[in-house]
Amino acid sequence: MENKKTIYFLCTGNSCRSQMAEAWGKQFLEDKWNVYSAGIEAHGVNPNAIKAMNEVNIDITNQTSDIIDATILNSADLVVTLCSHADAVCPSTPPHVNRVHWGFDDPAGKEWSEFQRVRDEIGEHIKRFSETGE
């Protein structure tokens, strides 16, 4: 019987950071967590996010850019906002939903090295969370 918790990664456009977080989450957390991502808006998956994750042998070409699903939001065990905009405007969550903010810079429109840096920072944070719960 599967009894996984649900983690929901949110950012503004569900294009870069939350896509990377979903991929890293599936890499490090999938045995204990159902992993989803969404945005305040759906901007499509950024091609550089796909390229950055391919560099670490994680394929996100089949991930979709989605707007926040109220059902997932209200039933998640943990909601993680990845940018200050999502943290500020994310719909309110019920008291039983643990909500935290892990801020990462937006690499969109920046140098390629920013995508790599943000990818690695998100991956390290999620790996640490998988090991320590923090």
From Swiss-Prot:
It is found in: Cytoplasm. Belongs to the low molecular weight phosphotyrosine protein phosphatase family. Thioredoxin-coupled ArsC subfamily. Catalyzes the reduction of arsenate [As(V)] to arsenite [As(III)]. It comes from the Bacteria. It catalyses: arsenate + [thioredoxin]-dithiol + H(+) = arsenite + [thioredoxin]-disulfide + H2O. It comes from Bacillus cereus (strain G9842). Its EC number is 1.20.4.4. The keyword Ribosomal protein does not apply. The gene is arsC. Its main location: cytoplasm. The keyword Cytoplasm applies. One of its GO terms (cellular component) is cytoplasm. This is Arsenate reductase. Disulfide bonds join C11-C83, C83-C90. GO terms for molecular function: arsenate reductase (thioredoxin) activity; protein tyrosine phosphatase activity.
